[in-house]
């Protein structure tokens, strides 16, 4: 294992700091990590880096700006690639450029391996697998964003501003923009219905929620990833013509509408003058972010309801992260575990044939045990309203079903 960055001096300083924090300062082996110096402006350095590894995990962003040289180097050297981006333009570009040839080589590029969109993508997969176990086909999945604590990074803000400044951004807003074209034998991909701003969904009462949902700012990112999962050939029989919706859980319709109004106002201001807000210090700059205390004490709790085609039964999933800020500490841990799963189990994974993949389409439930080491767990339950005790080991059972 090795850490890579542009600056050898900063890499050395990082190694020393991590050794101190983990009580390994002065140990002959230190952290046990090597270091590599590579720069996106130097393609030869990127290829040399990619040539040394089976799986490269990229945290460089905005990916629309810096990601393509890394992807090109990995493609050329045969390395698998994982990233944490939610940038649809970059994801679409690498799909169009690499997907078909990656499938011929059995090489995997797995995108969205962070908070967006591992919890949502895997929860959707586990829910539709549970419906399949019940003998039901899925009609719709609704993800309810619950209690969470975390901050926002300067890099995330920079990616958002970079996207807003892109005159081509409107080409990448459709929910199915990342979906695989498939073949004529597959189910049709119908246009997702326009979701209301505030809506009610049954099934959340199982988790103590009243079922009122308002807007979720990351639905546009997560929906594209999930629709790509649903569209890939080995996933289409399971997902069918699935509809995905996402919202933030609220105690009442009134609170959901109040939050929707506040979010709409904030989005309008950000859309109008993002660069001014950044200069005024309203947001962290690239390289800045939450305090260590917030990174260490953050968490998330989300719930998902998957309805059967006849709307008579449903499966629910509670996905939670308990070991840190979702967008920082937990994202880093999830991405590392995804990369580890790919490195250790590639040949037995659902996505072993390669391509530009999502977490669910590449790993299936095989990554669930890896994510548990990052403090991210999935509680799968089944039944109708008021039914459904916890299904012990449901996620593990799904993993075995996938492998079988």
Residue ranges and their predicted role:
Residues 54-55, 80, 315:
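Structural motif
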Residues 106, 129-404:
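C-terminal catalytic/substrate-binding lobe primarily of soluble NAD(P)-dependent oxidoreductases
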Residues 58, 62, 71-91:
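ADP-ribose/adenylate-binding Rossmann-like module
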Residues 34-55, 59-65:
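Conserved Rossmann-fold cofactor-binding substructure of NAD(P)-dependent oxidoreductases
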Residues 20-36, 105-107:
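A short helix-to-beta-strand connector/capping loop
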Residues 67, 85-107:
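Rossmann-fold NAD(P)-binding glycine/threonine-rich loop
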Residues 1-10:
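Conserved glycine-rich Rossmann-like NAD(P)H-binding loop of the short-chain dehydrogenase/reductase
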């Amino acid at each position: 294992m090795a850490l890579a960055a542009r600056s050898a001096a900063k890499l050395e300083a990082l190694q020393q700091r991590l050794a101190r924090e983990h009580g390994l300062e002065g140990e002959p082996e230190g952290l046990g990590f090597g270091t590599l110096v590579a720069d996106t402006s130097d393609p030869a350095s990127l290829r040399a880096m990619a040539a040394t590894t089976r799986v490269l995990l990229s945290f460089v962003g905005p990916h629309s700006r810096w990601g393509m040289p890394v992807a090109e180097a990995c493609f050329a050297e045969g390395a698998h690639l994982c990233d944490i981006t939610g940038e649809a333009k970059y994801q679409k570009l690498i799909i169009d450029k690499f997907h078909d040839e990656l499938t011929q080589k059995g090489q995997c590029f797995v995108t969205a391996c962070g908070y967006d969109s591992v919890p949502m993508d895997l929860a959707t997969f586990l829910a539709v697998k549970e419906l399949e176990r019940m003998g039901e086909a899925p009609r719709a999945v609704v993800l309810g964003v619950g209690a969470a604590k975390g901050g926002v990074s300067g890099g995330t803000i920079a990616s958002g501003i970079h996207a807003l400044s892109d005159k081509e951004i409107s080409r990448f807003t459709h929910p199915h923009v990342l979906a695989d074209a498939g073949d004529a034998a597959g189910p049709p991909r119908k246009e997702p219905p326009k979701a209301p701003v505030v809506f009610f969904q049954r099934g959340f009462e199982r988790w103590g929620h009243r079922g009122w949902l308002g807007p979720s700012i990351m639905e546009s990112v997560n929906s594209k990833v999930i629709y790509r999962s649903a569209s890939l050939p080995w996933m289409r029989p399971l997902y069918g013509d699935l509809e995905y919706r996402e919202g933030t859980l609220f105690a009442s319709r009134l609170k959901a509408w109040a939050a929707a109004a506040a979010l709409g106002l904030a989005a309008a201001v950000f859309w109008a003058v993002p660069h001014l807000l950044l200069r005024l210090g309203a947001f962290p700059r690239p390289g800045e972010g939450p305090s260590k205390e917030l990174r260490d004490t953050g968490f998330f709790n989300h719930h998902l309801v998957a309805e059967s085609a006849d709307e008579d039964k449903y499966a629910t999933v509670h996905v939670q992260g308990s070991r840190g800020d979702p967008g920082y500490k937990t994202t880093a841990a999830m991405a590392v575990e995804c990369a580890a799963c790919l490195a250790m189990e590639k040949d037995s994974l659902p996505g072993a044939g390669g391509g530009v993949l999502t977490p669910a389409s590449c790993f299936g439930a095989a990554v669930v045990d890896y994510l548990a080491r990052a403090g991210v767990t999935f509680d799968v339950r089944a039944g109708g309203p008021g039914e459904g005790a916890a299904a012990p080991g449901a996620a593990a059972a799904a993993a075995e079903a996938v492998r079988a």
